[in-house]
Amino acid sequence: MKKILFFIPAALYYALIFYLSSRSYDIKIDILFFDKVIHIVEFALLGLFLSFGYFMSLKSSLMMRAVLTIFTGIILGGLDEFHQYFIPRRSIEFFDVIADAVGVLSGFLLYYYFSRSVKGKIFTEKLSKL
């Protein structure tokens, strides 16, 4: 049961993503690939939170935790895009899912490198004792 608590940040953050993507926007920003950059950044944060959950709750191999983090992030990105089909003035874009996957991978790598640092090891050790 305690291990599920490590996924609360990811669940809350995904709820925020879902809420924000449920809104119809009339504002268009005419910067090339701006929306893809936003997808990468928001899903990099999700990747950080998912990585935190998997690293803290599983003692499996690095590869397994990487696959689970990236697979979960891609599924969540796909679900987010699918639900936008039902929102006025929103649409499904395949390249948004690609940007989401790049973001999740980036978030995983950031978490992995942080967790290998001295500060990251101390942080992880303190949390695992809770």
Where are these regions (language model features)?
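Bulky hydrophobic segments
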Residues: 1-88, 94-97, 101-130
